[in-house]
């Protein structure tokens, strides 16, 4: 039962605990139109979990540190966020190595948020509250976004279905690679790397997150050399090819200029970095839809707030926001690569990006049922420490609506870049054929690759070079409800 103070007592000057100010309502039944956020809270010593949850609700909606009489000039009972449930987090507290943590569920009325604005949504949900003294640590784990609010967003500019139609590529994952080294190449040498990768069988090549316009290579030179490579590789192979031209810059005006130049050169795709901010991302997504351009997002900077389990924000929330904002691609983990990624958590990320309707799945970190209405699907990108010898695992874990990006696994091939691309394309085609023939490609994966390598020297060399490479480290972000270990290869 709520312990809120009501009537004249509620508006007397002074400080009242958030729990008694109306921000804790255990009997509250969320409306279909409410936005619900689920936080992982570590309260300060001596602070009840309900008070900590109420404090988060208050500070992320209408409250300040003391009673203000101007509350009476608003429909404050409506506009207050309402913490309505707290649950102890499994495997925390007494008898464990971790302080006691709680899952806190908070409902927000839809009228608290500007339609179609990720910036306004985040200003409340992850604004001042993360520095609030009442909690020792705070992490946003998941959100339920009502359809009424989703419909105010554009969603992905292109979507998976239209992207495949434009590329004329179906029934398999797409293949890509990031140009390496990411910094230092001249424009001409950079373009040569792009050509070799595409000519060898990749669908895409990619700029890395921090290649923009530096003294060693101006952005315009890079665009010209890359598109020359794309056009030559397309003519040589008869396939539609692309290169993610990174238009990230210091101002929106510069980003629009670079995007327009990419369009004028015939590019099918441009790229931006997560660090440009939510408003800039939405702006570029609107431009991309207007100009029939695929929009790739590199999640640069994400791990600064998503990697630690007790504070920050789970990547699944970023996945939801970016689908709303309108990107077509986003890096979402590999399971078997060099970057952080628990198998169960990554399944939750991929489902969030690709499903029309996401059911509750606690083992995958999905705490809310989510109807995505008519928003397009996002194509997840798997990159970072993957190679041809893992192809059966990648197909099994990630499915076919994914882009597999083999950067070092292409450019580091002992016979060169084109041979590295050939190895990856042959490995993928062999695995897809085995799957389509009804073979158990997961169990027989190594054998399938060895059979293909008998007539493909680049694949044989790739398997020999990287067969013993593993990144078997413990994940920091694991499921709370199902014990799991990072996959080994």
Swiss-Prot record:
Q: Which reaction does it catalyse?
A: 2 (2R)-3-phosphoglycerate + 2 H(+) = D-ribulose 1,5-bisphosphate + CO2 + H2O; D-ribulose 1,5-bisphosphate + O2 = 2-phosphoglycolate + (2R)-3-phosphoglycerate + 2 H(+)
EC number from the UniProt entry = 4.1.1.39
InterPro entries the record matches: RuBisCO, RuBisCo_large_chain_AS, RuBisCO_lsu_C, RuBisCO_lsu_C_sf, RuBisCO_lsu_fd_N, RuBisCO_lsu_N_sf, RuBisCO_lsuI
Q: What positions constitute the catalytic site?
A: 180, 298
In-chain residues carrying the UniProt-annotated modification N6-carboxylysine: 206
Please verify whether the record's keywords include Transit peptide. no
| Residues with site note (Transition state stabilizer) | 338
- Quote the record's cofactor note: Binds 1 Mg(2+) ion per subunit.
Single annotated GO MF: ribulose-bisphosphate carboxylase activity
Name one process (GO BP) from the record.
reductive pentose-phosphate cycle
Coiled-coil segments on the chain, per record: none
Region forming the signal peptide: none
What residues bind Mg(2+), as annotated? Answer: 206, 208-209
What keywords were assigned to this record?
Calvin cycle, Carbon dioxide fixation, Lyase, Magnesium, Metal-binding, Monooxygenase, Oxidoreductase
What the entry lists under Pfam families is as follows:
RuBisCO_large, RuBisCO_large_N
The cofactors it requires, by name, are:
Mg(2+)
Q: Where does substrate bind?
A: 128, 178, 182, 299, 331, 383
On subunit structure and binding partners, the annotation says: Heterohexadecamer of 8 large chains and 8 small chains.
Instruction: Identify its protein family.
Output: Belongs to the RuBisCO large chain family. Type I subfamily.
Query: What additional remark is attached to this entry?
Result: The basic functional RuBisCO is composed of a large chain homodimer in a 'head-to-tail' conformation. In form I RuBisCO this homodimer is arranged in a barrel-like tetramer with the small subunits forming a tetrameric 'cap' on each end of the 'barrel'.
Q: What is the stated purpose of this protein?
A: RuBisCO catalyzes two reactions: the carboxylation of D-ribulose 1,5-bisphosphate, the primary event in carbon dioxide fixation, as well as the oxidative fragmentation of the pentose substrate. Both reactions occur simultaneously and in competition at the same active site.
Q: What is this protein called?
A: Ribulose bisphosphate carboxylase large chain
Organism in which the protein naturally occurs: Nitrosospira multiformis (strain ATCC 25196 / NCIMB 11849 / C 71)
Designated gene of the protein: cbbL
């Amino acid at each position: 039962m709520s312990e809120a103070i009501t009537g004249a007592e509620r508006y007397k000057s002074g400080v009242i605990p958030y729990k008694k100010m109306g921000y804790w309502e255990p009997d509250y039944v969320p409306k279909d139109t409410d936005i619900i956020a689920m936080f992982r809270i570590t309260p300060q010593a001596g602070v009840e979990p309900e008070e900590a949850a109420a404090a988060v609700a208050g500070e992320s909606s209408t409250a300040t540190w003391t009673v203000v009489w101007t509350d009476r000039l608003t429909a404050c009972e409506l506009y207050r966020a309402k913490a309505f449930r707290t649950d102890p987090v499994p495997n925390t507290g007494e008898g464990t190595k971790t302080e006691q943590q709680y899952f806190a569920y908070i409902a927000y009325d839809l009228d608290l948020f500007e339609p179609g604005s990720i910036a306004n949504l985040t200003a409340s949900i992850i604004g001042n509250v993360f520095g609030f003294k009442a909690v020792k640590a705070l992490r946003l784990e998941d959100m339920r976004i009502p359809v009424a609010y989703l419909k105010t967003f554009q969603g992905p500019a292109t979507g998976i279905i239209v992207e495949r139609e434009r590329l004329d590529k179906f029934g398999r994952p797409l293949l890509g690679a990031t140009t390496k080294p990411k910094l230092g190449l001249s424009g001409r040498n950079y373009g040569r790397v792009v050509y070799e990768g595409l000519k060898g069988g990749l669908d895409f090549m990619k700029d890395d997150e921090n290649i923009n316009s530096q003294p060693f290579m101006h952005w315009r030179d890079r665009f010209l050399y890359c598109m020359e490579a794309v056009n030559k590789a397309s003519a040589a192979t008869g396939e539609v090819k692309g290169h993610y031209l990174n238009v990230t810059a210091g101002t929106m005006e510069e980003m629009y200029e670079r995007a327009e130049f990419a369009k004028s050169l015939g590019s099918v795709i441009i790229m931006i970095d997560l660090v440009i901010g939510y408003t800039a991302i939405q702006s570029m997504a609107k431009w991309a839809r207007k100009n029939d351009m695929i929009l790739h997002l590199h999640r640069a900077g994400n791990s600064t707030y998503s990697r630690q389990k007790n504070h920050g924000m789970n990547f699944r929330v970023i996945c939801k926001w970016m689908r709303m904002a309108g990107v077509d691609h986003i890096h979402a983990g590999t399971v078997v690569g060099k970057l952080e990624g628990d198998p169960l958590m990554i399944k939750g990320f991929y489902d969030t990006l690709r499903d029309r309707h996401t059911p509750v799945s606690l083992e995958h970190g999905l705490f809310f049922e989510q109807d995505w209405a008519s928003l397009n699907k996002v194509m997840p990108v798997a990159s970072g420490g993957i190679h041809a010898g893992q192809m059966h695992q990648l197909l099994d874990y990630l499915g076919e609506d994914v882009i597999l990006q083999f950067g070092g696994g292409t450019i580091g091939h002992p016979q060169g870049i084109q041979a590295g691309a050939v190895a990856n394309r042959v490995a993928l085609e062999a695995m897809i054929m085995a799957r389509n023939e009804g073979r158990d490609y997961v169990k027989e994966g190594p054998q399938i690759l060895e059979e293909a390598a008998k007539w493909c020297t680049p694949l044989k060399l790739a398997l020999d070079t990287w067969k013993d490479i593993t990144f078997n480290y413990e994940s920091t972000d694991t499921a709370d409800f199902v014990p799991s270990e990072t996959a080994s290869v």
